[in-house]
Amino acid sequence: MSFALEIKKLKRTGFFPAFLIGALLASLFPVVNMAARQEMFVNQPLAPLEILLNANWSMMATLNVFLVIIGSCMMYYGEFANRAIEKLHMLPLNLHVLFFSKVFLLLAAFIPVLAIEEAVLLFCSKHWFSEKELQLDLLLGNAGFSLAMLLPVILLMLLIASLCKNMWISLGAGVILLFSAQTIYRSDSILAKIYTFSMPYQFLTKDCTPEKLAPLFLVWAGEILLFGAAKMMLIKFRRTPV
């Protein structure tokens, strides 16, 4: 019921067209990059997918995170407009369920986005690296990994958007967090590994093992629990609707 209600509300906004445009822009980047600098990439002694991800994933991840920011702001802009969220609090609805319906809807919106992006990476692999192994298993694994890495960002961004009646404040906060992630995600510091907005910049390679990924997923799970618990506490103790 709550999930269907969220979809119905978002149909009145530009939410779904925005995600389609974002997916197409993110997918266009590796094609243009490969076409413009083909010789730089095809001669590298790496697997095709690793070459493509090293060259393009930072931009693709940036666009994906920006879609999270835009999507979160759109979801709560509709709630705060004309005090709609206050009316929701008067209805016999579970507010925890409403929030997590938004989380899962935003996460589900990235399934077709990542499918388009991975399909384009597959096309680039076949077109420019036809003589090398395609690594379909790693491609599919990376799609699932990328979707998982977006979940803490979605939770945090929806939490921020739910606290800001002015959409431009939550949008600005999200952009600041995104730009700060861009300054640290390439470093080997602990902050780069645990910072929520830098997680989507990471991707799987053939060298990734469960032992190497275990610390990352421990932080990932901790952030999910932290942001989810923070929202539940706000709903319980805050007097104004969130």
Residue ranges and their predicted role:
Residues 37, 41, 77-80, 84, ...:
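Membrane-interfacial segments
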Residues 23-70, 100-165, 204-217:
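Secretory targeting signals
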